[in-house]
């Protein structure tokens, strides 16, 4: 590898002495770690906090899975890489398109640039929706790259993933999508890849099924973090550089009777502006709606008549639980969003509220526990835990989760 590698106008070290490992622990906020630590369930993470770094940083807005995973692996916000939700809307065609195809990426990943410089890359993600985005720019024909998901671990091939027969290799069956097992598979695979494949860079991305269902301190949540800690201990070998962060936090979003706490914005705008005059887009929506019912804290709104923007904003602002209501240009500048993939208006809800489209459009039949969700400013703050001291923080300003690889790679040079 060269002495330095430039990725999206940021300079990263080219010569690594150990493996740089970043883990995106989906849906994690500091309270999960704190509660598990009180019961002495996380000795390895506690050691990181004591001897390395225990920081709180911002995730990208919207605080959803796709934008933040891609921010972490490009080192930049979605204004640069283009992935600003799980899906987006094209007004000219009326299409709502899942944003999991690499054609929507506008910037290379750190993996791609390091791979092109000769590095070995290992990536394991819980859900397959991220896999093609994460592996974009990698080739799997020279034994230098591996990328697969827990969800479709039984469908891997050398050509597509750089590995085959993962379940036999790992000794674990394909986990249920809605289970702790999906994330445990990621961690177990990461440990085995570290010791056998010996990558220069490794990225492990879990799923937030547990965090959507269980609050910090609940027994199931504590069990999850104890499991995670065990694998962290197995990754913390040979002076490897490890940073644990998250794509977003999580907040309770239910009424006292257990039903979801939501403002159905499409219904409101249909009444105030007229039918078919607006389109409310909820970028949290993806194929895995069982645990959130497509309700999150962020929405973007397209208007048929652009002259109605101020009127629409004034109507939305009548609801105190919609805390942020901004025009496209103001919101995109403030939160580093791609203007052409956002609507005319951008909204974020209060801490315990979500934004829905039409009440009849949301299916809660599979939502067994009180709703916990994310997407806005109240779920933005996430942990940033390093096993090594960071001596060269670029600024005293708050860091972002997408600084993780910058500091993990720096830590791998010593």
Report residues per predicted region.
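Short catalytic/ligand-binding loop motif for oxyanion handling, primarily in non-cytosolic enzymes
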Residues: 30-32, 65, 129-135, 210-214, ...
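Low-complexity, glycine/alanine/valine/leucine- and proline-rich hydrophobic stretches
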Residues: 349-410
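A short beta-strand-to-alpha-helix junction
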Residues: 105, 190, 223, 278-295, ...
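Secreted, luminal/periplasmic, and some membrane-associated catalytic domains
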Residues: 18, 88-101, 107, 212-215, ...
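Active-site-proximal N-terminal segment of extracellular/periplasmic enzymes that hydrolyze or transfer
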Residues: 2-53
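Short, structured active-site-proximal loop/turn typified by the sulfatase FGly-forming signature C/S-X-P-X-R
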Residues: 34-78, 122
């Amino acid at each position: 590898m060269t002495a330095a590698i430039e990725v999206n106008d940021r300079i990263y070290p080219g010569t690594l002495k150990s493996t740089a490992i970043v883990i995106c622990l989906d849906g994690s906020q500091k309270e999960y770690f704190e509660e598990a630590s009180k019961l002495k369930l996380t000795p390895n993470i506690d050691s990181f906090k004591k001897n390395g770094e225990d920081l709180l940083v911002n995730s990208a807005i919207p605080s959803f899975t796709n934008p933040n995973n891609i921010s972490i692996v490009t080192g930049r916000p979605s204004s640069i890489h283009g992935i600003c939700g799980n899906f987006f809307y094209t007004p000219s065609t009326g299409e709502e398109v899942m944003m999991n195809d690499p054609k929507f990426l506008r910037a290379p990943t750190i993996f791609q640039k390091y791979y092109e410089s000769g590095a070995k890359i290992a990536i394991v993600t819980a859900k397959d929706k991220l896999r093609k985005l994460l592996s974009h720019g990698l080739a799997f024909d020279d034994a230098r790259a591996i990328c697969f998901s827990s969800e479709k671990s039984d469908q891997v091939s050398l050509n597509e993933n750089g590995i085959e027969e993962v379940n036999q290799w790992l000794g674990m069956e394909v986990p249920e999508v809605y289970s702790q097992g999906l994330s445990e598979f990621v961690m177990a695979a990461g440990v085995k890849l570290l010791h056998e494949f010996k990558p220069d860079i490794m990225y492990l991305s879990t799923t937030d099924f547990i965090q959507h269902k269980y609050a910090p301190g609940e027994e199931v949540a504590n069990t999850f973090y104890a499991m995670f800690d065990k694998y962290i201990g197995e990754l913390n070998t040979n002076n490897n550089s490890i940073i644990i962060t998250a794509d977003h936090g999580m907040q309770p979003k239910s009424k006292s009777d257990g039903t979801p706490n939501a403002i159905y914005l499409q219904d409101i705008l249909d009444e105030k502006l007229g039918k078919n005059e607006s389109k409310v887009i909820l970028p949290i929506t993806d194929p895995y709606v069982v645990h959130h019912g497509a309700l999150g804290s962020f929405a973007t709104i397209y208007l048929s008549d652009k002259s109605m923007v101020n009127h629409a904003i004034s109507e939305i602002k009548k609801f105190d639980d919609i805390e942020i209501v901004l025009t496209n240009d103001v919101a995109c500048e403030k939160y580093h969003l791609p203007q052409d993939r956002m609507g005319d208006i951008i909204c974020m809800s209060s801490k315990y509220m979500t934004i829905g489209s039409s009440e009849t459009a949301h299916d809660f039949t599979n939502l067994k526990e009180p709703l916990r969700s994310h997407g806005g400013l109240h779920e933005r703050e996430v942990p940033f835990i390093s096993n090594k001291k960071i001596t060269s923080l670029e600024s005293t300003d708050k860091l972002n989760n997408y600084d993780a690889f910058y500091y993990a790679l720096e830590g791998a040079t010593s």
